[in-house]
Design a protein with these regions (language model features):
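Mixed-charge, low-complexity intrinsically disordered regions
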Residues: 1-431
Length: 431
């Protein structure tokens, strides 16, 4: 451990890791570059936007039999959203990263340079990469910029620093190729995890998150639509991309104020069975409906509605309403063990391929944890098994897997205390 006084304000700054190259003074936000037993002030670092993450500097946990503590963070923003990378220090002196993106987590450690990879610009979602006998599938391809940071970090970053990264998955295995520096990417290897798996201590409590999320210190977010003035129901930093239900204007609230991303003509409100702000009790957790979007099958007439729910204790959940009924949908942290042209195996269960089709967003309202745009399209492949429907969704930059389980309309009625309204709407839709 290395302690010294901040050359800008005099406050104590601690380097807990011998490999940390920089630290951000928590009092004056000066970026301090370590040079031997001294530091150099490299200017101010932007303040991090407090978001929905329960993690903070000083959070501790266990991974692979080793205790760790969180000592730093960078926030990275891409065109359609942002995520956190937490720098963690293990009790044996080694270090790693805890990735935190919309409630999905992964721990990775540096395994050195990779010299057997395709160029960054040639990698596509679903592409394969083999390492140590395991074939990984590309899940995310991102060019992002650093917008803020805090604590200790192993290299110098600042506003404008650009990251080019590709994430790969296989089951719970997780691998990142970082093309940000040098002629060859660095390879980080680990696995997808839940906070419960890490046995985390000193997490932020839900009430604390609700008080601070979405606010820069000293600033509060505006909640009036910048285009028409209508009120937008927004849970700060839980979801930074907003669609006005009155005029359809798309706004970005990630910087603490509402900024118009795309103005749209005033359009009629879409009729939906559930409404923004509806509250439910599902699986012992309280949920609030924060966003909804209507989708249509590409080149066909089939339509459905997807509802995004948020819980302070459990994160995000989707409910999908279609002419076939209701489904509760969970985005998967652990991916299928095997995928072929006709079947998928996930957690020991076989799923048979049913259909492949395109989906296009035709309407969006409320708040989302990524940028949703009318016209967005993805390619979907459905697989049916005894535990539900397993689906892959592929866009130009991302591949995700989700598991949908059929839910009776009467159960949805009970969750939302709708007194038969959901069941009645489902009966009409099925006619």
């Amino acid at each position: 451990m290395f302690k010294l006084a901040c050359p800008s304000c005099g406050a104590e700054v601690v380097f807990r890791s011998a490999t940390s190259a920089m630290a951000v003074c928590e009092y004056c936000r000066s970026t301090l570059l370590r040079e031997g037993d001294a530091v150099r002030d490299a200017g101010k670092m932007a303040v991090v936007l407090e978001d929905y993450s329960p993690i903070r500097i000083t959070t501790s946990g266990m991974y692979a039999g080793k205790a760790f503590g969180v000592v730093g963070r960078i926030q990275l923003r891409y065109d359609d959203g942002f995520w956190n990378e937490w720098y963690i220090l293990f009790d044996d002196g080694s270090a790693g990263w805890l990735s935190d993106a919309s409630g999905q987590y992964a721990v990775t450690t540096d395994s050195g340079e990779a010299d057997d990879t395709p160029p960054f610009g040639q990698i596509v979602p679903g592409g394969q990469y083999a390492w140590e006998g395991v074939s990984y599938t590309a899940s995310d391809i991102r060019t992002a910029r650093c917008t803020a940071g805090e604590g200790e970090l192993p290299f110098q970053v600042g506003p404008g620093w650009e990251a080019r990264v590709v994430d790969y998955r296989q089951g719970v295995r997780f691998l990142t190729l970082d093309f940000s520096e040098g002629s060859r990417p660095r390879r980080y290897v680990g696995k997808a995890v839940g906070l419960g798996d890490l046995r985390c201590q000193l997490l932020r409590e839900p009430a604390e998150i609700a008080r601070s999320a979405g606010h820069l210190k000293g600033k509060a977010a505006a909640l009036a639509c910048p285009a028409c003035g209508a009120s937008i129901d927004w849970r700060p930093a839980v979801a930074a991309h907003l669609h006005c239900p009155a005029c359809g204007t798309e706004s970005d609230a990630s910087a603490g104020t509402l900024e118009v991303m795309e103005a749209r003509r005033r359009e009629a409100l879409a009729a939906t069975t559930l409404a923004l702000g509806d509250e439910a009790r599902i699986d012992g957790q309280d949920w609030t409906l924060i966003g909804l979007m209507k989708c249509r099958e590409t080149g066909a007439a089939d339509e459905w509605t997807e509802y995004l729910l948020y819980s302070e204790g459990a994160g995000f959940l989707w409910l999908v309403e279609s002419s076939a009924g209701w489904d509760k949908v969970r985005v998967l942290d652990a991916w299928p063990e095997s995928v072929s042209a006709s079947a998928v195996r996930y957690e020991g269960t076989a799923y048979t391929r049913m259909q492949a089709y395109g989906s296009q967003v035709t309407y969006a309202a409320g708040a989302f944890n990524w940028r949703v745009k009318v016209g967005d399209s993805v390619s979907i492949t459905d697989y049916r098994g005894s535990r539900g429907t397993l689906s892959s969704e592929r866009s130009p930059a991302e591949l995700t897997w989700s598991l949908a389980q059929r839910v009776p309309a009467a159960t949805v009625d009970g969750w939302f205390s709708k007194k038969g309204k959901v069941s009645a709407a489902s009966t009409v839709a099925a006619l």
